[in-house]
Amino acid sequence: MTTALVFFDSLPTDGALSAGQKELLAAAHGLGEVTVATGASGEAAAQALDFAEISTVYTGDGEIAAPDAALVDLLETAVQESGAGVVLGSDVSETTDALARLAIRLDTGLITGGIAVETSGEQVVVTKPVLAGTYTTTASLADAAAGRPLLVTLRPNSIDAEQVAAALSPGAEAEITGLPVSAGLGGGAAAEGQIEILERTELEKSERPALTEARVVVAGGRGVEGDFGPLEELADELGAAIGASRAATDAGWIDHAAQVGQTGVTVSPQLYVSAGISGAVQQRSGMQTSQTIVAINKDEDAPVFEIADFGVVGDLFEVIPQMVQEIRRRKG
C-alpha cells in the first residue's frame, strides 16, 4: 500500500464535489492512504472534503488559482510532507499543466489520460488507451525514477458510480494543514516572469453537466448544418452534455469548448450519441473509450459505424425527434 496525494486545483463553491473529483478520491483509496492538496482555501476544503478516508488536506494561505506557479509549490511541498508514492489528478488542462511542471521539478514520470490505476507489488500501474483508442496499454514508473512519486491524470467516468459510493464515507471532519508557498499571483508565476494574468471572466454557468465529466454526451458534426436544436432537445431529455466535431466548431456553430477529439477534449461517458459526424480518426480519439456509442449518419459507409455499438442510417433531423418522442413516452 502507498500514500496517494489527490490534487484539486479548485473546489466547487457550493461544497459539493463533482463526480469526477469523487472518482479520484475513490481511486486513491484503492491504492492506500488518501491525502489531498488543493488550491482552494482551507474553509472551502473543510466544507467539500468531509470524507473519512482522507487523512490530511494540504492548502496554501488562501485561494491559489491556476495557472499560478504557487500551485506547483504547494504540490511539491505536499508530496514531501505526505511521502506520497503517487499523485492523482483529473485529465484536464489546468491539472495536467501543474503536474507536468511538478514532474520537471521532481525529475519523475507523468502518465496522462489514464482510465485505471492499481498497485502491482510495489509498483503503481496505470491503464490507458493509446493510438486514438485503438489499443489499451499499461505503464508504470521506470526503474531510473525509483523512489520518486508517479504522477497520473485520470479521465472522468473511469470508475463506476457504485464503486465510488462504496469507497467514500461522507460526514467526517477533514484535517486541514496549511503549507508555506509563494504568495499567490504576486509571488508565484508572475514573480518568475512566466505568466501574467491580465483578466479573469467568470463563464456563464450551464444547467448541463460538464462535458468532460458527463455520463451522457450528445455530439453533432457537419451533418447538423448549423442547427443544434434537435441535439439540445435530446440532451435535455437525457441530462446530457453537448459535444461537437471540429468541423462544427470551426464553422462557428458551437463554441470550441465543445470540441471532442484529438485537438479537443477526451470524454468517456456511459453513453455517447454521435449525430452527423463521419467519425474520422481525430474525432474518434476523443470518444472511443465511451461505454456505449450510438451513431446516426446518412452515409452507411461512415467510419463512425466501425466503432458504434448501435448504428442508425438516416437523417438526424428525422431520427432524433423520434428518439425524443419515444423517451418522453417512456418517461410519461
Language-model segments: residues:
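N-terminal glycine-rich FAD/FM-binding segment characteristic of electron-transfer flavoproteins
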Residues: 1-332
